[in-house]
Amino acid sequence: MKTFSAKPHEVKREWFVVDATDKVLGRLATEIARRLRGKHKAIYTPHIDTGDFVVVTNVDKITVTGNKAEDKKYFRHSGYPGGIYETNFKKMQQRFPGRALETAVKGMLPKGPLGYAMLKKLKCYAGEQHPHTAQQPKALEI
């Protein structure tokens, strides 16, 4: 018996919608990364993108445990000498609501072209509304 390897054109992608209200950042990101990679499917193949699309609503209501709202730091650099900027989780959520979740999920996906393709299937929205109703996403409880 040969080892099964999924073909890219044989993969059936589904759409899921997740309500992130009062969900913990890391636990939510772990399940989303798992869905984006396709590890929940029997046809999972590491070198093929077998994952599904995930739409996350209410990303502005994600929480973190403990004192991480103040202590968790995000860094970015302007490209100039001394141009490093530091922002905590609380300010990041106010300014860019979806970026904390995207950063957490990005760290859990493979690095390289395959990981970038998987990350494009993540859609984050601050409110309850999203423009993907035509895809008829299934509700996913996490």
UniProtKB/Swiss-Prot annotation:
Part of the 50S ribosomal subunit. The lineage of its organism: Bacteria, Pseudomonadati, Pseudomonadota, Betaproteobacteria, Rhodocyclales. Keywords: Ribonucleoprotein, Ribosomal protein. GO terms for molecular function: mRNA binding; structural constituent of ribosome. It comes from Dechloromonas aromatica (strain RCB). The keyword Lipid metabolism does not apply. Pfam families: Ribosomal_L13 (PF00572). This protein is one of the early assembly proteins of the 50S ribosomal subunit, although it is not seen to bind rRNA by itself. It is important during the early stages of 50S assembly. NCBIfam families: rplM_bact. Belongs to the universal ribosomal protein uL13 family. This is Large ribosomal subunit protein uL13. GO terms for biological process: negative regulation of translation; translation. The keyword Lipid biosynthesis does not apply.
